[in-house]
Amino acid sequence: MASDNCKGIVKMGSYFGYAVAVTDINNDGYDDLVVGAPTFMRPGFSGRLEELGKVYVYLQRGPLHLQPAQTHLLGSQVFGRFGTSLAPLGDLNQDGFNDMAIGCPYGGDHQQGLVFIHNGHAGGLKNRPTQVLSGQWASSSFPASFGFALRGNMDIDQNGYPDLIVGAFGLDKAVLYRARPIVRASASLTVQPTMFNQEEKTCSLVKQDKNISVSCASTRFCLEAHGKHLPSHLVFVVEVQLDSAKQNQKESVRRALFLESQQPTLVKTLNLTNGERFCCETKIYLRLIL
């Protein structure tokens, strides 16, 4: 029996409490409570009850004072047993809130099992998963029960980010998912002057052994990347397109080109260190249309 705190209705046979996890989701210094109800049912479009499973989130607002979160998480897989297992993951995306893995061991197209990754926020767990892990590698002849058991919040590979172990008891196997470092990158592009003056031809273009005066402008693009526990060097491939709206138009002519290459596309491979800002300046010119 379980009380649906959203509607105040008692739900019979939902197995409320089958899985329980404790973690400080909203990072307020108080542990919060997450409760799985894997056989929770609700009426479907036809009016018949559908077993979807549900996960309830209770935020601790003070010592021993739990309140229901703004939203609870409802499963999307009929008979998938969403909420059979729960695993706190720590802060996967480094946003200051702790995240949660939720097992749905009979979900998916072939009922092989799914694991949903839900990120935390100030009001509990986000309703939409940011990632869904599937047991497609498992045999289809026997239910794999991928996600029946979960263990997270352990940095197994020592890269500074928590990893996740997923058990599939139908195959007597467990799978390790390593969390990859989070890289936050920002890019900017400026053009000066912002408009071409066709009367001012201050750049020289070499074409067919001839020097041609053309209208030009200076472009400057910058890239910065930073994050926690990153490698010493980060490799980026940067592509800058001029007049990109005409890229997929047949028989269209791009009017702006890069002066050095006389092409509408510039591709550069950049090797940055963590926190470094790299900028590159080049010239573009207005193409002569005869």
Language-model regions: role of each:
Residues 115, 121, 149-190:
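Blade-level signature of beta-propeller repeat domains, shared across WD40, Kelch, NHL, RCC1
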Residues 18, 51-55, 113-115, 172:
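Repetitive beta-architecture junctions, highlighting loop-to-beta-strand starts
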